[in-house]
Amino acid sequence: LMLTVCDEAMVRSVEKACVQEAKECCVHLKIDSGMSRIGARTELEAQQVLQTLQACPHVRLTGAFTHFADADGQTEEFTRQQFERFQQLTAALSSDIVRHVANSASIHRYPEMHLNMVRMGISMYGYPPVASELPLKPCMSWKTEVTYVKKIAAGDTVSYGRTFCAG
C-alpha cells in the first residue's frame, strides 16, 4: 500500500509520524481533477503541497494520481477533461514518479490512459463498472461511514457519474 497526500497538512502529519518512528515514507499525491473529493484541485494547491514535500526530508513523492468521476458514463467528454487536467497539474513533476488515473471503467474503455499503472477497483470485487460490458458477479458488500467533508463551489459535480451538482 502507498500513502496518499492531498494537502500540506497531510504531508506535515506524515513527516511528523516518520520523525517519531525514525522512518522514511513514500507517498502519492492525489489530484482532484473533477471528482470533488480529496486532492489538490488547482495548480497553486499542487505547488503548495510540492513545496511542503520538499521541506519534509522523511517523505518522498513517488507517484501522482486522480480518480475519474464518470469513466463509465454515456459520454467521454468529462473523463477526457479530467485526464487533460491531471496531465497539466502533473506536467512539472519528475518523470520518475508513477502516474495513475485508470479505474475499473477506464481500464476497459480508455487504454490510452493507463499511464504507468492502473487501479483495478470495483471490478476486482465482482462489480462491473458497466454491467453490459463485463460478465462479473459480486463477491462481497461494503459498509462505511463519513470520514471527510470537503467544501466545493456552486456548479462543481461530485462522485461517480457526477451524481450531485452543488447549487
Task: Cite the ranges covered by each PLM segment.
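Catalytic beta/alpha-barrel core
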Residues: 1-11
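Active-site loop/helix belt of alpha/beta enzymes
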Residues: 9-26, 32-156
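Short, intrinsically disordered, charge-balanced linker/junction segments flanking boundaries
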Residues: 158-167
